[in-house]
């Protein structure tokens, strides 16, 4: 069953309501799936450029440090062996790709579960805009967001062309801004509340509906 939420305005009034489709905002959250998707997402962000030198890559050490026999010490062939200070590293990290392959349907299902969890707890909000007019105002945007939620971490989803809203909240601590096509499980779960502009909410719903219809037609 679709959930209806009110659309708030910066002036403190209500400008109608919007429906959150049940297939996107009221599905059972699969915790294991969300964990898998978030783990893959964070792994893909890793640069993987870490690198250590083996004994063959460390400069120097070509000369045998002392003769093979007669010193009473253990035989050594190079001062760049791992047991020496300044020597190579054994089994150290090497450059690698940490990204994992995650099917698109799993990514979409995890996002639906995360949004549904926030919606069931009343943490999805819809607004007409973050500030009135075309002049950015961090002070006004902060005051408006404080009327929506008192929690610290807020995910703001706005259209790419909404520069006024973006410039108004980009410096606010605890506020993360993304466009509807960038919406992902990690950002939703990290945020306490998700604030959609009506434009962004409709764009997300329409995109997901179109994708579902396309998948149904190709099945």
Swiss-Prot record:
Gene Ontology MF, one: rRNA binding
GO BP term, pick one: translation
Disulfide feature: none
Oligomer and partners: Part of the 50S ribosomal subunit.
Protein name: Large ribosomal subunit protein uL4
Keyword Oxidoreductase appears in the UniProt entry: no
Record-linked HAMAP family: Ribosomal_uL4_B (MF_01328_B)
Keyword Ribonucleoprotein listed: yes
Gene coding for it: rplD
Domain of life (superkingdom): Bacteria
Family, per entry: Belongs to the universal ribosomal protein uL4 family.
Annotated Gene Ontology cellular component terms: ribonucleoprotein complex; ribosome
Region entry Disordered, spans: 43-100
InterPro entries, sorted: Ribosomal_uL4, Ribosomal_uL4-like, Ribosomal_uL4_dom_sf
SUPFAM superfamilies xref list: Ribosomal protein L4
Function: One of the primary rRNA binding proteins, this protein initially binds near the 5'-end of the 23S rRNA. It is important during the early stages of 50S assembly. It makes multiple contacts with different domains of the 23S rRNA in the assembled 50S subunit and ribosome.
Biological source species: Mycobacterium sp. (strain KMS)
Gene3D superfamilies the UniProt entry points to: 3.40.1370.10
Assigned keywords, A-Z: Ribonucleoprotein, Ribosomal protein, RNA-binding, rRNA-binding
Coiled coil: none
